[in-house]
Amino acid sequence: MLLYNTLGRQKEEFTPLRPGKVHMYVCGITAYDYCHIGHARSALVFDVLVRQLRHMGLDVTFVRNFTDVDDKIINRANKEGLDWREVAQTYINAFYEDMDRLGVQRADVEPRATDHIQEIQDLCAKLVAEGKAYATTSGDVYFRVRSYPPYGKLSGRSLDELLSGARVAPGEEKEDPLDFALWKAAKPGEPSWESPWGPGRPGWHIECSAMSESYLPLDIHGGGQDLVFPHHENEIAQTEAVCHCHLARYWVHNGFVQVNAEKMSKSLGNFKTIRDILESYLPETLRFFLLGKHYRSPIDFTAEGMDEAEKALHRVYTALLETQKALTREKWKKSPLPAQLTEDWAAQAEALDEAMNDDLNTAQALGHIFTQVRLVNRLLEDKTLRAAEAGRDLLQDFLARAEQWNTRLGLFGQQPEAFLADLRRIRAARRNIDIPRVEALLQERQEARANKDFARSDALRQALLDLGVSVQDTPEGQNWDLE
């Protein structure tokens, strides 16, 4: 498998440091607000990466942390008159709810910063002892950036470039504007812990170094592209300065999310939480949308893009439903399928594997899935092919492949009939279509057809079309969908 390594700035063959085992650490949320679409993308990317590694037969230990003490958490607690621990727990619970809805599997280990205060202090003490960090008279501890010559190797930034934008805030006792905080001296009204430098709390960067320490060296360290600098750059410096080993062999970062071609921000009024989106769309639609673009590419969140994802899911689930029906009603004949159809079917499974092994190219993998759906639809639409025993085998293989796609991508795993009903419901809600009214018209039309009142049946079909509802008559009865 090839993975793009931010450190080497190229795709590299993935080789675990320990045969058959993978240690992977991904930076999780700072628990002060509901997760937005950027959090969803990062979570989904690394969820699929873990799934793919396990599909390859590797034993993966996946660690994803929670930052549960931070300036943003403290500020929110003070603003709302709450205990900071209550704020953190509220949004950790919300994270789990959102991720469960999106089908994101839980990490194997989920450390919290406040459970590792001793490890954080121990790491700070080692850095001070080795001259890589220093304590100030006010009780802050800073990392000496110039003490780590490779600083900037991940982001590709030079010290001169960084120095031009560095500042020392009033009251800070930094030796150098480049230095960053490992331990912050206590302030009135803030949580703090006793330490060798006086009461205080950890800086953001040191938390991840301490929480990942017992899994070193890591095979993969991941996160969003926004974490490359300064967070991951600082993690490398403070960890490698004392462990004298590589923090991680592969650094994997997912691209940014924009909303309607603009940066997502509360000030622009386009800030989209996962919960906002799932009021109007099914969770699987958001999952499909985010996996429909290569993970390193930027993605633009639009209603049009979500509508297209919805249509794509409709095609796949409709093919799955029609396949299930065909397998229960057909009488099979001993006849082969066209050689080209059989060859194309076999080739697509291999092509999907190649896409997933080429830097987790989910966009290309989904393209191969839709090629398979087209092949299945071609078979279903041809009575001769559909009734062939070889056709039955292909349809059964289609259902088996869909189960594998669900295992690897977290898609197409629901019961087709139930999913399509949920899809109709949520699309109808977006369009303010009254489903009980639709169902009443369908019932009336069914009665008209039973009474052979075809003029009335046609009038009711038109009434449904005027509502945006199409009706298809089948041997099993009426099927309806939204136009």
From Swiss-Prot:
GO terms for biological process: cysteinyl-tRNA aminoacylation. A motif ('HIGH' region) lies at residues 29-39. Its cofactor is Zn(2+). SUPFAM superfamilies: Anticodon-binding domain of a subclass of class I aminoacyl-tRNA synthetases, Nucleotidylyl transferase. It is found in: Cytoplasm. Keywords: Aminoacyl-tRNA synthetase, ATP-binding, Cytoplasm, Ligase, Metal-binding, Nucleotide-binding, Protein biosynthesis, Zinc. Its EC number is 6.1.1.16. PANTHER family: CYSTEINYL-TRNA SYNTHETASE. Belongs to the class-I aminoacyl-tRNA synthetase family. This is Cysteine--tRNA ligase.
